[in-house]
């Protein structure tokens, strides 16, 4: 039995230099599991000639109700006016966003026999960022080298991928090493109660009937032909047409690693072929803002879901004159963000400019790159 939904009256507050700004008619706070950093855009009303004491590079916190959901920096504070309205639009992103476009620099550029949290801490420490470990990070990495000109985000994601860890950022702006969907949110998505609108966002465009990975090994216990011709394959039984995909693993690999790669690819692409975007009333559920990376129960007979728990992988909280305060939730099966220790990365060129930190190979360009 699902408890009856009761709408909360939460407010979004922007806290800059100790001053809380709230009570506007438009706002947007966007967080996504595939982007390392959250973003915000909020116009603040002002009296002409008396602009608020907010400037670029100021530290900022975004609160929904009493809960901090984003800690970052102001990137723009631009004035605007029109008939009957005057204000300043404040836009920015969470602290970890600094890693997206900046280069990774570390003395020597190499680590030996180091765990991934040490590698990642060394990369992000110059940016003033902390690292929070929320999962098992596995054994040490024997050798890790920075690529020349490699971005800090790419280096962090590559290190995490070696041990099957998902990289995101938390509400305090720290880099978070975690897994997908380890917690369940107390709220539910219920058609006829808190749902305003829903649309399906799934597609089989990126799925294949069989995934075939090839690689080479320098294992001295194997004969030459075995080492040269490692191969693993996995089938997606739901794809009935002949749609094979070959993945070429760069660098030294093993049979077990190739098998992990193809099975992981099946799960992730299948998970990403399914999804829904829900618009729900309000910004919170029983006083708690809708969270990222938690499972949520969905009761929707149109979607064919009766209590199934899907992963919240996108949260956008908005306010406008038409809809009031609403939250857009993107949900997918948890397996869409499955993680597994991988040396090989299948390149993706459709990430946009926010940076991708997920541990899965999918996308339009499926040539493998060494990790």
Predicted regions and their residues:
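An acidic/polar, Gly/Ser/Thr-rich interaction patch typically located in mid-to-C-terminal regions
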Residues: 22-53, 196-371
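Short hydrophobic/aromatic-rich beta-strand segments that constitute the beta-sheet cores
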Residues: 101, 176-178, 213, 298
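Short beta-strand-centered interaction patches in the first periplasmic/extracellular domains
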Residues: 1-5, 85-87, 94-99, 133-207, ...
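Assembly/oligomerization scaffold segments
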Residues: 1-104, 164, 190-197
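Short, compositionally biased
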Residues: 75-83, 181-183, 309-321
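Short, charged, solvent-exposed linker or helix-capping segments at domain edges/interfaces
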Residues: 100-106, 187-190, 323-324, 340-345
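Amphipathic, non-transmembrane alpha-helical segments in extracytoplasmic/periplasmic proteins
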Residues: 18, 40-42, 74, 92, ...
